[in-house]
């Protein structure tokens, strides 16, 4: 089996994959060519859609993204190719990042950080409290759910 990995990996991760799939051919390429796609039985990662992924021999496309909308359009993949995504993998990390960015924005932390770096302690806009605020979450998949769960504390 020929496995094409175009997901962003650290060197140690690449080495582990090669060691685990010792009986298979593993090609690791951040920018796969059409020739790489043409020869792959399995693709791990999100290959560019300008490549022809509609290959009869392609058994599976294992995306490293939570969404797969662009890959399910008619003609992108062969009907026999299995498609998976990483839905559920990013909810906690991204939701905590979103909450951190909300607090940073609402409390003008960027302004304060820049002033602190420059040694200036100038009065600045107070900012807005998150407590009892309304938040609109667009999309209620795993990431939206995890954001809502954390915002409930406010």
List PLM regions with ranges.
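N-terminal glycine-/charge-rich "phosphate-binding" loop or analogous flexible N-terminal tail
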Residues: 1-41
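Glycine/Thr-rich phosphate-binding loops of Rossmann-like dinucleotide-binding domains
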Residues: 13-14, 52-53, 71, 145-146
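A short, aliphatic-rich alpha-helical micro-motif
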Residues: 36-38, 55, 130
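Phosphate/diphosphate ligand-binding glycine-rich loop within oxidoreductases
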Residues: 41-113
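A short, basic/flexible loop-to-alpha-helix module at the beginning of a structural domain
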Residues: 118-128
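Rossmann-like dinucleotide/phosphate-binding beta-alpha-beta segment
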Residues: 126-154
């Amino acid at each position: 089996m020929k496995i094409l990995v175009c997901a962003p990996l650290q060197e140690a991760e690449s080495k582990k994959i090669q060691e685990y799939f010792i009986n298979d051919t593993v090609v690791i390429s951040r920018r796969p060519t059409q020739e790489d796609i043409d020869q792959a039985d399995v693709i791990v990662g999100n290959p560019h859609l300008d490549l022809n992924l509609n290959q009869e021999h392609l058994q599976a496309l294992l995306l490293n993204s939570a969404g797969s909308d662009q890959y399910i359009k008619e003609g992108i993949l062969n009907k026999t190719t299995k498609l998976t995504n990483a839905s559920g993998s990013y909810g906690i990390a991204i939701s905590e990042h979103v909450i951190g960015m909300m607090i940073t924005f609402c409390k003008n932390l960027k302004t304060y950080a820049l002033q602190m770096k420059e040694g200036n302690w100038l009065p600045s806009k107070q900012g807005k409290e998150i407590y009892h605020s309304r938040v609109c979450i667009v999309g209620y998949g795993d990431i939206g759910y995890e954001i809502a769960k954390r915002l409930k504390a406010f």
